[in-house]
C-alpha cells in the first residue's frame, strides 16, 4: 500500500514539473504581450484562428494564446493569472481534472483553456452547477472574451429554442449540466433540422466537476410526460371498438400470436372513430391502441397469460412456473389494454420519451475537463469512467488552516449542545463561524438552538442560489454566524472581513461526517483560502447515520468504559479520525460500485440510443429522396414475415402470408390464396417461398409508386417520407425505453438464481432491440401502403386533393391526364390501370372474367 501511495505522489510530482515547464513558456511571452496595443492584442484572436486553419494545433498555440488571455485579463478585469493558475489551465486543456483549492481562482483559470479551445470555432461549453453561477460567470468573464473578439452565450431553461440556438452557436456557451442534457434529448425528438438547437458536442469544461460527474452520476435525465386522461380514455375506446368486431373483421396468426384488422375491420374502425382513413399518418398512435386492444381481447387469455387479483390488479403469469410475477407489467401499452378489457382501473403511466445519464451525456464530448477543490479521493472513478486524470495543482500560498481532530459524543443532543457552546464562545470574541450540516432538518434544529442562545445567524439551505451567494460572501465578516447545508453557496468564495485574520480566520464547524470524504473536504476548504488562517472542527455522535452504520464496536466500548452515565463525555483522538475515514472509504466504495453498475446498464441503452439517434439525424438532414430506404424496409418486412411463416404447416403459412399482405401491403381483394399458391408453385411437399417474396415485393413496389404519385412535388415527397419514418421511430423508441426499464427491474432478481443480471440484460435487450427494428419497419410498411395521402394545392389553397390506397374514390375510365384507358391488353393478374390498387380481374376486368 505504501509503495502504491509513493508511486502516486511521484507521478504527481513529475506531472507538476511538466506543467511548470509549459507555464514558464507562457510567462516568457508576458513582456511581448504587455507591449502590444489594445488593438494589436485583440487582433491576436483572428491570427490564432487563421493559424489553426492553416494546420497549427491548439497545443502549439497554447503558450502564446494563454499569454494573450493573461494580458487581456489584466487590462479588462484587473486580474493577472498566477503560475499555478496557468498550470491549472494546461491541465484543463489536456482534458483532465484540475484539483484547485478553494479561493485559488478557478473561474479565472478556466479563461485560458476556454479561449484556446474556442479558437477552433467548434464551440466550448462551460458547465456550472446552477443557473445563477452560469449567469454570474458569463457576465464577469464574458467581458474578457468579448474584448478578445469571441462571442459568449448563456443557455437558460427559460429561453426559447431560437434563443438557445443562438447561445449554442456562440464561441463559448455557459450552461448547467441538466440543461445541456435536456437540449440534447429534445434535439433528438424534433422532426426538422431547423428545430435543433445544439451543435455537435466539442469541448466541455465542468466547474465543480465532482458534483456533476460523481454525485449526480446516478441521476438520469428524463424527458417524459404523464399520459393524459384522454390517452387512458383511448384504451377504453379501443377496447369498446374491438368488442364490436366479429371473426370476419380480423385475422389471427396463432403460431406468431399476431392479429390485425382486415378490410371490413378497417371500415368499422373508420366508422367507429369517425376517420377518413385509419392508416393516415396522423393516426399512427390510434392504430397502436387498436392493435393492443385486439391482442388483449383475442390473444391474451385470462388465467393463462394473466390473472385478475382480488385487489383488481392484472398480474402476469410466468409461462414456465405458473406463478404470478409481482411488480411486472406487460410493455408497449398491452398491460393497460388488458386492464381496459377486464374493467379494472387503468393505471396511469408516465411515458419516457428519452433519457440519458450524466455519465454518458458527458462522455459524448470530444474532450472533457473539469475543476474542483476536491477530486483526488475519486481519482479512480474519473479515470475508469471518463478517462480523466486528477492533477492536484499547488496552492499559490501555503495552507495555514488548522484541521482539528474529530470530537465524538455519545448522543446527538450532547453533540449539538457542544456545537452551540463552541459557536457562542467564538461569536463572543468576534470570530466568524460557518456551520455545515448534511440535512435541512439539522440546519433548522441548530438554528432554533442558536436563537435560544441569543446568537444572530443566517441559514442557507441551497434553495435560492443568488440570495445565498450574497449571504455566503459575508460569512467571513467579524461576528458572522452562518448555517449551511453542504452544497449551499458552493462556487462563491468567503472573503475575510477586517480584523478577522487576527481572530484566527473563519472557523468551519461540521455537525457530522458525510459518507463521502470529498464532501467533508469541501466544507473544510471554505476556510483558509489563499493562505489565510482558519480552523475546522467536526463534531460527531454515536447516533449519527455514518457511526450507526459503520462505527466500530471498539469506539463504543471506549465510550462505555469512560462513563456510561455522562452523555457529555467526549473522545478526541487520531484513532477516531482514522476509524471514521475507514468507514467513509467503505461507503465510497459501495457508492462507486453502484454508479459503475448504473453505467453498465446505461451503456447498453447508449449503444442502442446512438444507433437510433444517428439514423434519425440522417433522416432529418437528408436532402435526398428516401425511397431506397423505405423500399428496403418494405422488402425486409416481407422477407422477415415470409420466413417466419415458412416454418409453419404449409396451409397455415400461406394463410398467414395472405393475412399479412392484406393488412400491410395491398387492398384485400388485390391478392388471394390462389395467387400465392400459383406464384409459390405449391405442391403437397414444397412451396417456393423465395418466389412469393419476389411477388409480394413487386406488388408492394407498385403500391408504393402509386402512393408517391399522389404527391405533387419532390419537396412534398421528402416531407411525407421524413414524417412517416420519424413518427414511427419515435413511437417505437419510447415504447422500447419503457420495456428496457421493466427488463432492468426484472433481471435484478436473477442474481439470486446465480445468473449475472448485466449479462442477462445485455442479451435480452439486444433481442428486444432487434424486435423493435422489425416493428419499426413493419409500421413504416403498413402506414406507407395504407395511408391516405393528402397534399394542399399551392394554387388552390381551399381545394384538397384526397386519394386512398384502398381505392375508395369513384373510378372513371380515364387516367390522371384525362386520356382514355385501353383495357384490351391488360392481363387478369395485372394491376388495374385505373389506379385503384386492385387486380384487373377484381376491378374493371370483373365482368370480363
From Swiss-Prot:
Disulfide bonds: none annotated. This is Protein translocase subunit SecA. Its main location: membrane. May bind 1 zinc ion per subunit. It comes from Streptococcus thermophilus (strain ATCC BAA-250 / LMG 18311). Transmembrane segments: none annotated. NCBIfam families: PRK09200.1 (NF006630), secA (TIGR00963). It is a peripheral membrane protein. GO terms for molecular function: ATP binding; metal ion binding; protein-exporting ATPase activity. It catalyses: ATP + H2O + cellular proteinSide 1 = ADP + phosphate + cellular proteinSide 2. One of its GO terms (cellular component) is plasma membrane. The keyword Cytoplasm applies. ATP binds at residues 85, 103-107, 493. Belongs to the SecA family. It is found in: Cell membrane; Cytoplasm.
